[in-house]
Amino acid sequence: MEHSSWHALIKAQLPEGYFGKINQFMNQVYVQGTVYPPKEKVFQALLTTPLEEVKVVILGQDPYHGPGQAQGLSFSVPDSIPAPPSLQNILKELSDDLGVKKSHDLTAWAEQGVLLLNACLTVPAGQANGHAGQIWEPFTDAVIQVVNHLDRPVVFVLWGAYARKKKALVTNPHHLIIESAHPSPLSVYRGFWGSKPFSKANAFLKETGQEPIDWLR
């Protein structure tokens, strides 16, 4: 993380010594019990999508809390693991919008400039939101602010009430915000179906002279 294009800019947004607190927190929780994702994957979103390549941000809440699911990218799971319900619904909406993506590992999106960021970067096994409010939110808010300060137009995809609160951090008029209900089975019928976020994001990227994302990869 220290050698990534993100490090200095995130650090500048945070109180002095905050990175040290994050390291302390991680050293503590990974010793105390099972935590997801694996420690080496906690910053995977930032390592896979360098700041200079960000075109789209898809904001999640926290990692999946079952064995083998979380890989440090919001909503994504390895292909060896069945897609959780929210991801199934994302891929169904993609299928209705642009076509079928065969893989439910979203790494190919991240490699094309889609920052798959969770607001909370770790979770205790079996406890959704178990690390919420402890350390991560100021850090991931700083990530959003760093992207917000870019001159290059970026698409922010905000699904559900939690993600939509982060709209307050996106103040740059160059950027596009696409928001809808969350893809979880509880809320998918409240406006996620038919929202076409993928084609909308690509239309904006083309309008602003950028390469669209190949969402089917």
UniProtKB/Swiss-Prot annotation:
Its main location: cytoplasm. This is Uracil-DNA glycosylase. It catalyses: Hydrolyzes single-stranded DNA or mismatched double-stranded DNA and polynucleotides, releasing free uracil. GO terms for cellular component: cytoplasm. The active site is at D62. One of its GO terms (molecular function) is uracil DNA N-glycosylase activity. Its EC number is 3.2.2.27. Keywords: Cytoplasm, DNA damage, DNA repair, Hydrolase. Belongs to the uracil-DNA glycosylase (UDG) superfamily. UNG family. It is found in: Cytoplasm. Excises uracil residues from the DNA which can arise as a result of misincorporation of dUMP residues by DNA polymerase or due to deamination of cytosine. NCBIfam families: PRK05254.1-1, PRK05254.1-2, PRK05254.1-4, PRK05254.1-5, ung. It holds the Pfam family UDG. GO terms for biological process: base-excision repair, AP site formation via deaminated base removal. Coiled coil: none annotated. It is an enzyme of class 3 (hydrolase). The keyword GTP-binding does not apply. The gene is ung.
